[in-house]
């Protein structure tokens, strides 16, 4: 254009700038505007409006204001379009007070703010969490003779629903009806979706029926919101009925609709229904996405159908839907829980080959699986790899590591890790301390366990019932029954209250020590607390009864 002779008119340049601005290439518009000036092509009001709008869209308000000043010096008066662009810039640029002031200035300057102006300001007020001012502005619009339109009400309904002010959104529907403005499917969808998010499923269904009564045709968004909500409540038949209903009305379900149903069905173990939906998706040429496959794989893993989960994993890869970290984490967890740790390890290696780096969950899951499998050496190797790969262990990782080391007779190694944790900035919780106390007691180092237990109050950590039971069990293993009983007394006085495990541990210890009277007293106390003998206690009493060391009254007391 700039090489044409004669030069095209400013109107032609403005058409070009406007078209580029609509494509949201604001930097290019600004650059072209500067080039026009260098070539001596003067801007007119329309050009300035386009450029000011572009600066505002780029959140460069100061440059927009500078251009406004230049334009006014050249004798151009800003139009309602100019000021609306600035208003939009203020609203999106965290300058809401300037936006409100600008509207007041517009009135003082003799401009009459229109529906677009007010709607822009209302949207800005909601963006800045000023809902009451936004709602009040709707009434002010009417007072100033500017009737809110469907877009205005849509903005207000959306803002209220995002805040959870659903009652106010309903009031607005009534206002619209009084003003003879018919709410459209978008407004109904907004309220229905909000009702679903805040778990008012029956209200959402009632509103759905109301919109149909008013002749407003629901769309795929309406159905998807309701189906997803019904699924989260386990109302499968209602969700399936809605799916049938939308298909009957020639409203094609989309990926969101199918994903909601599939995710819900697999979590409930309804795999036949989930797989039928998956097949139906493919028949309708809707490509399942990573969420679809992850839902199916997660459901299969949750219900211990690992071979089916692996099949689905291989199928998704064959369809060029590549597994993500969630996919691998789900499968690794499933295999480790089912004691198929080798399969989990193989997937872990495959991840690396695909260029995926495991996260804290990946490593922690695999470490736990290896420890449960008795593979202490490889569990430690994976932990070392985790640290060398720069993946930060969390408190759960350390808890699993310490527990695994202690349970596999590696107390010294556990103590090294524990010592490192104490010296670092890791905030240790009661579960970590309980694990170490148990590890010490199991290794016969009850005195060390006792010292650590006694230090908890100095560390500002309150022992829970498991901590007490662990320490009582350790003391009982060394036949330190008086000390164990003293802990029971402390629990009753200071909390936490003893549970079934506390009493059963002490009862067995006194029985093994031959103190029938103390055992009988503990049984009576336990029963008064509505606890009963566990399998280990009943088994011990039965054996002692068989050997003639106890009479039947003990068994009767426990039953």
UniProtKB/Swiss-Prot annotation:
InterPro entries: Pentatricopeptide_rpt, TPR-like_helical_dom_sf. Keywords: Repeat. Disulfide bonds: none annotated. PPR repeats lie at residues 9-43, 44-78, 79-113, 114-148, 149-183, 184-218, 219-253, 254-288, 289-323, 324-358, 359-393, 394-428, 429-463, 464-498, 499-533. Belongs to the PPR family. P subfamily. This is Pentatricopeptide repeat-containing protein At1g63330. It comes from Arabidopsis thaliana. The lineage of its organism: Eukaryota, Viridiplantae, Streptophyta, Embryophyta, Tracheophyta.
């Amino acid at each position: 254009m700039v090489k044409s002779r004669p030069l095209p008119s400013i109107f032609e340049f403005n058409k070009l700038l406007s078209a580029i601005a609509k494509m949201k290439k604001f930097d290019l518009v600004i650059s072209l505007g500067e080039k026009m000036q260098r070539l001596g092509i003067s801007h007119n009001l329309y050009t300035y409006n386009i450029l000011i709008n572009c600066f505002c869209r780029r959140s460069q308000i100061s440059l927009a204001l500078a251009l406004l000043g230049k334009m006014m010096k050249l004798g151009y008066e800003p139009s309602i379009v100019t000021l609306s662009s600035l208003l939009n810039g203020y609203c999106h640029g965290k300058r809401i007070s300037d936006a409100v002031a600008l509207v007041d200035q517009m009135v003082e300057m003799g401009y009459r703010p229109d529906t677009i102006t007010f709607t822009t300001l209302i949207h800005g007020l909601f963006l800045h969490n000023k809902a009451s001012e936004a709602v009040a502005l709707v009434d002010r619009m009417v007072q100033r003779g500017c009737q809110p339109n469907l877009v205005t009400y849509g903005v207000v309904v959306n803002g209220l629903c995002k805040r959870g002010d659903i009652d106010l959104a309903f009031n607005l529907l009534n206002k619209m009806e009084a003003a003879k403005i018919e709410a459209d499917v978008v407004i109904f969808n907004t309220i229905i979706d909000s009702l679903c998010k805040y778990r008012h499923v029956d209200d959402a269904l009632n509103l759905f029926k109301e919109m149909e009564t008013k002749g407003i045709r629901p769309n795929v968004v309406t159905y998807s919101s309701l189906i997803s909500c019904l699924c989260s409540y386990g109302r499968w038949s209602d969700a399936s009925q809605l799916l049938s209903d939308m298909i009957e009305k020639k409203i094609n379900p989309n990926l969101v609709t199918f994903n909601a149903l599939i995710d819900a069905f697999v979590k409930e173990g309804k795999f036949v229904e989930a797989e039928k939906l998956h097949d139906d998706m493919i028949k309708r040429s809707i490509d399942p996405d990573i969420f679809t496959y992850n839902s199916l794989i997660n459901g299969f893993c949750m219900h211990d159908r690992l071979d089916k989960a692996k099949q689905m994993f291989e199928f998704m890869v064959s369809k060029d839907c590549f597994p993500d970290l969630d996919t691998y984490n789900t499968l690794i967890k499933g295999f480790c829980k089912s004691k198929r740790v080798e399969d989990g390890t193989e997937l872990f290696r495959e991840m690396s080959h695909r260029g995926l780096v495991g996260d804290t969950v990946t490593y922690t899951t695999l470490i736990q699986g290896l420890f449960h499998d008795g593979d202490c050496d490889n569990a430690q190797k994976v932990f070392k790899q985790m640290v060398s790969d720069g993946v930060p262990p969390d408190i759960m990782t350390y808890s699993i590591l310490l527990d695994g080391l202690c349970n596999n007779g590696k107390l010294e190694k556990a103590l090294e890790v524990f010592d490192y944790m104490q010296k670092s900035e890791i905030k240790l919780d009661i579960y970590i301390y309980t694990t170490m106390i148990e590890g010490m007691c199991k290794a016969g180092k009850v005195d060390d366990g006792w010292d650590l237990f006694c230090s908890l109050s100095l560390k500002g950590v309150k022992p829970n019932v498991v901590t007490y039971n662990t320490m009582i069990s350790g003391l009982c293993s060394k036949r330190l029954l008086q000390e164990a009983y003293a802990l029971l007394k402390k629990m009753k006085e200071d909390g936490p209250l003893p549970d079934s495990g506390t009493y059963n541990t002490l009862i067995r210890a006194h029985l093994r020590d031959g103190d029938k009277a103390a055992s009988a007293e503990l049984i009576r106390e336990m029963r008064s607390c509505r606890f009963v003998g566990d399998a280990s206690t009943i088994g011990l009493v039965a054996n002692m009864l068989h050997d003639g060391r106890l009479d039947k009254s003990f068994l009767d007391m426990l039953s």
